[in-house]
Amino acid sequence: MDAIRIERLSKTFPNGRKGLEDIDLAIAPGEMVALIGASGSGKSTLLRQIASFSSSDARPSRIDIFGRSIQRDGRIARDVRRMRRDIGFVFQQFNLVDRLSVETNVLIGALARVPMWRRLAGRFSRADRALAAQALGEVGIAEHARERAANLSGGQQQRAALARALVQRARIILADEPIASLDPAASRRVMEMLRALNANHRLTVLVSLHQIDVALRFCPRVVALRAGRIVYDGPSAALTRERLHALYGDDAHLPFAVGDEVRPAAREAAGEPARRAPAAFDSAGSPDLPDSQPASPRRMLAASSMR
């Protein structure tokens, strides 16, 4: 059974622009997959469709999460909120509530599986708090649990979002440009944490990235989008400069500045020892712009709780 299965998915925006066109994609449980493409290629749109934040075109299509249909033929499943419990969504914009403590922000992940009266009262059990403490320790920010989220750096806020996904007990993490606004050191830590969660918890990870070097280092498989279509789906080791130019033409050098030819993710998948990260990762490029406008804080909080 696939963790994510998509068949014939298309998405047209109200202005008539095609966001996605005939997407077919299957991701197995425990895979770590990079989603790459220029701004506007459909990366964010695809991730939001998988989470069913909006419906696809009304035509034969389907999105299944662990064998259950979350969206079919342009209609979102009635029990979509229940199904979203399996999905932890990490936004590019840090979607924490600034005035709340880091611990409380992480505990929001537990809201989807607690009784309604506890949701309304905002009461969390000792077990929930113990799980939050464990998750914060796992992502390396346990000492900030009682601080306001506003005091965290960008990289720490993204790690708090990952801790929230652990408290949510998500089986899939969808990360939409999680390092686009971070400095190189913070970017590396967030990606290392995603890889650790993938390895230690066998979480399925689909992460959209703007830097090809990062995709090659951390993800054994790459899915490339161009103008809403999948133009490559295969091992990161096969994604050479020549292949990139064939896929993206003269635009290949703009969003995809490949450093050297080191591809640790591909080597590790083949059982070979990893090497040092590409130099280009140490000097990551400028932040990407999201495919769509970020949601308001209230909408992001509602989405993050997956209630």
Swiss-Prot record:
Residues 265-307 are annotated as: Disordered. It comes from the Bacteria. It is found in: Cell inner membrane. It is an enzyme of class 7 (translocase). The keyword Phosphoprotein does not apply. Belongs to the ABC transporter superfamily. Phosphonates importer (TC 3.A.1.9.1) family. Part of the ABC transporter complex PhnCDE involved in phosphonates import. Responsible for energy coupling to the transport system. PANTHER family: AMINO ACID IMPORT ATP-BINDING PROTEIN (PTHR43166), PHOSPHONATES IMPORT ATP-BINDING PROTEIN PHNC (PTHR43166:SF6). This is Phosphonates import ATP-binding protein PhnC. It comes from Burkholderia pseudomallei (strain K96243).
